[in-house]
């Protein structure tokens, strides 16, 4: 088997989520208000009990409150917020508890289907709980009986959000504050997978019955041209086919179209649910075998086995009128069919490098 985009493994660093950054900065700003002490480091406890110290970029008093910021270090995770300034602006209020607001660069929820209600700042439940627990402990330590108003912001967050799925999810004005463990694990892409699940939830909550999970922009364009689906029905799954298929077990839809490049679909057809080259490779001998089942001669099968890429294998098959794209889609559909509930109508589409549909199975 050949890997079309080989990568050299290297040691990778862990990082911290925007939720951890928000917790650290809100705690530092609140502590300044209650004690008069401005910190340059702040200790927080992550949801699984780990204690971490986070460095602050600033911690200072403001008119009527205090603010603190930190530079988000995502480690070696491919994250649009890596290096961004995450900050909290805190005011003391009479009513106990914590009230959250969206500061500059943090979005507001405008569609049903997410874990946060419509009209609320896009600060997810675990970061909210982390901040609430840390601020409650601080208040108890200093005998403070009032509450806190906390606005979380991200510098340049509105522009960064355009590189995420937030606009499609109906989160407007900026980024989401995320995290379930407080730690960013390198290449776990947990935030990306969570956004896939959110996309499905939002589609369902808004009455969408046919969703299309696509590996990239070209496959989205192909599905949009074929079916005229609205953006809310398009799920950008990237390489995470398994994240879509497994989630549909508990959040079912009437109809699912899976669309991707021929090479990606051939990986799914071979049973791989993570389509990235780190985790799965193009299986040219298997493509040759499938071509043989579709009528390819022994000579053509040999040429496919010796091909440099999946696209070359496809071109060879098409030149001899062998429907390799349809065969791959049929196998990919079978893999998907084994995972999703029986009531889901599953279709698979494969496209070539020019975005043309070269395989269909339904």
From Swiss-Prot:
Swiss-Prot/TrEMBL keywords: Cobalamin biosynthesis, Methyltransferase, S-adenosyl-L-methionine, Transferase
Gene3D superfamilies, per database record: CbiD-like
Q: Name one GO biological process term.
A: anaerobic cobalamin biosynthetic process
Q: From the UniProt record, list the reaction(s) this protein catalyses.
A: Co-precorrin-5B + S-adenosyl-L-methionine = Co-precorrin-6A + S-adenosyl-L-homocysteine
Name the Pfam families on file. Answer: CbiD
The pathway where this protein functions is: Cofactor biosynthesis; adenosylcobalamin biosynthesis; cob(II)yrinate a,c-diamide from sirohydrochlorin (anaerobic route): step 6/10
- Which GO terms fall under molecular function for this chain's record? cobalt-precorrin-5B C1-methyltransferase activity
Judged by the first EC level, this protein's enzyme class is transferase
Record-listed E.C. numbers: 2.1.1.195
Is-annotated flag, keyword S-adenosyl-L-methionine? yes
The record ties this protein, via HAMAP family, to: CbiD
Q: Give the family from UniProt.
A: Belongs to the CbiD family.
What is the protein name given in its UniProt record?
A: Cobalt-precorrin-5B C(1)-methyltransferase
Whichever gene encodes this chain, its name is: cbiD
């Amino acid at each position: 088997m050949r890997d079309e985009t080989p990568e050299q493994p290297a040691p990778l660093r862990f990082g911290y989520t925007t939720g951890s950054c928000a917790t650290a900065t809100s705690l530092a700003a609140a502590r300044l208000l209650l004690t008069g002490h401005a910190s340059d480091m702040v200790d927080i406890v992550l949801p699984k009990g780990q204690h971490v110290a986070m460095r602050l970029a600033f911690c200072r008093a403001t008119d009527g409150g205090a603010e603190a910021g930190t530079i988000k270090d995502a480690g070696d995770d491919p994250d649009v917020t890596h290096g961004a300034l995450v900050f909290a602006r805190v005011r003391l209020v009479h009513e106990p508890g914590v009230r959250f607001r969206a500061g500059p660069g943090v979005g507001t929820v405008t569609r049903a289907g997410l874990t946060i209600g419509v009209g609320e700042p896009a600060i997810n439940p675990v970061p909210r709980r982390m901040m609430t627990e840390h601020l409650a402990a601080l208040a108890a330590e200093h005998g403070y009986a009032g509450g806190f108003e906390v606005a979380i912001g991200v510098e340049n967050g509105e522009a960064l959000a355009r590189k995420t799925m937030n606009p499609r999810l109906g989160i407007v004005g900026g980024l989401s504050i995320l995290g379930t463990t407080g730690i960013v694990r390198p290449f776990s892409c947990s935030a990306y997978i969570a956004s896939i699940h959110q996309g499905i939830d939002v589609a369902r909550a808004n009455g969408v019955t046919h969703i299309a999970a696509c590996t990239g922009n070209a496959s989205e364009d192909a599905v949009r041209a074929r079916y005229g689906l609205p953006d809310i029905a398009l799920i950008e799954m990237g390489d995470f086919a398994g994240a879509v298929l497994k989630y549909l077990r508990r959040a079912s839809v009437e109809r699912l179209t899976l669309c991707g490049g021929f090479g990606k679909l051939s990986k799914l057809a071979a049973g791989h649910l993570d389509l990235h080259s780190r985790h799965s490779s193009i299986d040219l001998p298997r493509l040759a075998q499938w071509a043989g089942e579709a009528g390819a001669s022994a000579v053509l099968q040999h040429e496919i086995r010796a091909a440099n890429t999946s696209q070359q294998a496809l071109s060879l098959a098409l030149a001899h009128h062998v429907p390799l794209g349809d065969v791959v889609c049929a196998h990919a559909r079978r893999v998907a069919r084994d995972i999703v509930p029986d009531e889901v109508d599953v279709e698979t589409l494969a496209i070539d490098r020019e975005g043309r549909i070269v395989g269909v199975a339904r």
